[in-house]
């Protein structure tokens, strides 16, 4: 009976340890995903800013061409 009791405690202990390790890895993976999403969001906003700058320059150039044509 004592042998079965020790075996049962050993199995439960090992199960809890493996469960703890799995939870720790799961949390780490979630944190990594959150960091990746934040980095992707920042890159996307930088790309948008760059695109808006280009659009502003093009509109400004077209506007100045339009003014020149009106003067002639």
Swiss-Prot record:
One of its GO terms (cellular component) is other organism cell membrane. Residues 38-47 have a biased composition (Basic and acidic residues). Expressed by the skin dorsal glands. The keyword Oxidoreductase does not apply. Residues 23-49, 69-72 form a propeptide. Residues 27-47 are annotated as: Disordered. InterPro entries: Frog_antimicrobial_propeptide, FSAP. The keyword Membrane applies. Belongs to the frog skin active peptide (FSAP) family. Aurein subfamily. Amphipathic alpha-helical antimicrobial peptide with weak to moderate activity against Gram-positive bacteria, and no activity against Gram-negative bacteria. Probably acts by disturbing membrane functions with its amphipathic structure. Strongly inhibits the formation of NO by neuronal nitric oxide synthase (nNOS) at micromolar concentrations. Acts by a non-competitive mechanism, probably by binding to calcium/calmodulin and as a consequence blocking calmodulin attachment to nNOS. This is Aurein-2.2.
